[in-house]
Amino acid sequence: MINRFSIEKVKGLEIIDSRGNPTIRVFVRTNDGVESFGDAPAGASKGTREAIEVRDENGLTVKRAVDIANYIIDPALHGIDVREQGIIDKILIDIDSTENKSKLGGNTIIATSIAALKTSSKALGLEVFKYIAGPRLPKIPIPLLNIINGGLHAGNKLKIQEFIILPIKFNTFKEAFFAAIEVYRNLKGLISERYGKIYTAVGDEGGFSPPLEETREALDLIYTSINNAGYQGKIYMGMDAAASDFYDPKKEKYIIDGKELNPTQLLEFYLDLAKEYPIVYLEDPFEENSFDMFGELQNKLNSTIVTGDDLYTTNIKYLKIGIEKRSTKGVIVKPNQVGTISETFEFTNLARRNSIKLVTSHRSGETEDNFIAEFAVGIESDFIKTGAPARGERTSKYNKLLEIENKFGLEYGGKYFYL
């Protein structure tokens, strides 16, 4: 008897992401004709320990990744029960046989892994978030909205990569999200008034890139916008420093705001900012090997969630180091960094067991697929990072969260969040 859940076909397709770059979409179809897909996102700022993408012609195509899906992965997964996520991912890992997924490509593998999960949930007639959550009743995560861009995400002189708002003190996700939109609109008007309308054009993640030179200029703009919108004490602030990008390893200095700072001086810089602004979130404040400096900052900023992205790259090996050194209270969760859904689950489960906050994140190169929103709800992520409330590939995620809240009545995580 044919198993209706068995995989009948795996097929790759070259598509484009939100930056116009090629990426891979993988379809997985069962014997019963149930089919879904997974898209591989791509980052601009990447940790050196991330899974390696397979690309051709200086990154201009992913034809080889498509061929890998069609001619290597397809026969390898043929006949496998699509509900067996662990088995599917192990097959992919074993065929690849490299630590950084460079043989099959992290992009090919994660697209296949996502496609299998989505096809399985569809075959069982379940929403993706319900399939992941199981019997648990999850909450809607608090959004981290990147509304001013710097670093590799912008063309200005700001070194900090993302300036973020966190709408926390609200009863529902809808209330929180639309309050954040008010701040975003207020900021747009402020930038237009001070720097000209041309600087209200949005970047890769929907944030603005005004001609600013120093960190406090950006923080002042956002703080003013929060106050003007009337949300002081309800909407807080955060930053993704992406400090590896402004670290000079030869000098062992951080080049920021026209100064060269050693690690201790940079730590003091962050402490001063936390005194001046309602900053409750600080991501990648030091370069990606500085577990001890992360821990020292977290110890001194107890009410701020210091978070590791490049520090961990969603890899359990590095998370164990961070746990041992008590480096952070938060971890970024990006499935494409490690390559499979199963490995991502291992990472999030270990973080949860150690009371570390989960921050599920998009990448700067995204597609219109809203999988990451459902994934964030399913794992009961504390936060979700998916850009500003602009650009279709960002708003598709927010709209999915609004839909889930409206349809299933899930509670908002901010309602129970204490700083």
Swiss-Prot record:
Q: Which organism is it from?
A: Saccharolobus islandicus (strain Y.G.57.14 / Yellowstone #1)
Note the Gene3D superfamilies from the entry.
Enolase-like C-terminal domain, Enolase-like, N-terminal domain
Catalytic activity as recorded in UniProt: (2R)-2-phosphoglycerate = phosphoenolpyruvate + H2O
What keywords are assigned to this protein?
Cytoplasm, Glycolysis, Lyase, Magnesium, Metal-binding, Secreted
Q: What is its EC number?
A: 4.2.1.11
Which gene specifies this protein's sequence? eno
Biological processes per GO annotation: glycolytic process
InterPro entries referenced in this protein's UniProt entry, alphabetically: Enolase, Enolase-like_C_sf, Enolase-like_N, Enolase_C, Enolase_CS, Enolase_N
Specify whether Magnesium is a keyword of the entry.
Answer: yes
Recorded metabolic or biological pathway in which this protein acts:
Carbohydrate degradation; glycolysis; pyruvate from D-glyceraldehyde 3-phosphate: step 4/5
* Binding-site list for Mg(2+): 240, 283, 309
Q: Which cofactor does it need?
A: Mg(2+)
Q: What molecular functions are annotated in GO for this chain?
A: magnesium ion binding; phosphopyruvate hydratase activity
Which Pfam families does the UniProt record give?
A: Enolase_C, Enolase_N
What name does UniProt use for this protein?
A: Enolase
Active site, UniProt feature? 205 (proton donor), 334 (proton acceptor)
Sites binding (2R)-2-phosphoglycerate sit at 161, 334, 363-364, 385
Q: What does the UniProt function comment say about this protein?
A: Catalyzes the reversible conversion of 2-phosphoglycerate (2-PG) into phosphoenolpyruvate (PEP). It is essential for the degradation of carbohydrates via glycolysis.
Compartments in which it is found: Cytoplasm; Secreted; Cell surface
